[in-house]
Amino acid sequence: YTVSEINVDTRYETPKAKNVKLTDGDVDLTVNVKFNNELKTGSIKINKQSEDNQNGGREFTVTGNGKTYSIKTGSDGVAILSDIPVYDSNNQKIVYTISEKNVPVKYVVPASQTVTLTADATTTKTFKNVLKKFTAQVTKQDSETASAQGDGTLSGAVYGIYRNGELVDTYTTDENGYFKTKEYVCGNYTVQEISPSEGYLLDETVYPVGAETENYSIEH
């Protein structure tokens, strides 16, 4: 005889059928056949990416169906959570929430992501860390009148952006004495005039600019 379990709940793997052999001498014999229902499971793979390629040792939590799992990426930026249930006790797919924890302050905290699983398969989610950045806006003015005097002009002055004493970029003022920098990763920088506009002496003042990462939660 072949004994098979039928109408197996969705959350379980269907167990293999079992064969039972009875002989003429087995009168009034009860044969016990044991079936073990195993939950359907799947896996979650997290790919960690960041603008500065520092992806190892990042911490994540995966929560769902009243349970929380903690995992950490390897040096390759990959973390895998294996063999977790696909369905809950009501045979409904479990919605798992993946969150990155203890994100270094230099990054914007990425949004949590949700996922449902497929039995005997790996579902992949990618988390990207964006570095916090800032821009600086500089306006050159006449020290007495703010506007240019006589034959002087506020346009054409060249300024340098420095970090740790090294020149990063140069910018030139427009007709209003203005320029705006591109985005820079948050940190401490300085602005200094390299060559003045026509009619003016060089301003040798070193102006600090920058942004402290702990004061911001967004990219810009």
Residue ranges with predicted function:
Residues 1-220:
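Solvent-exposed loop/turn and edge beta-strand elements of beta-rich ligand-binding domains
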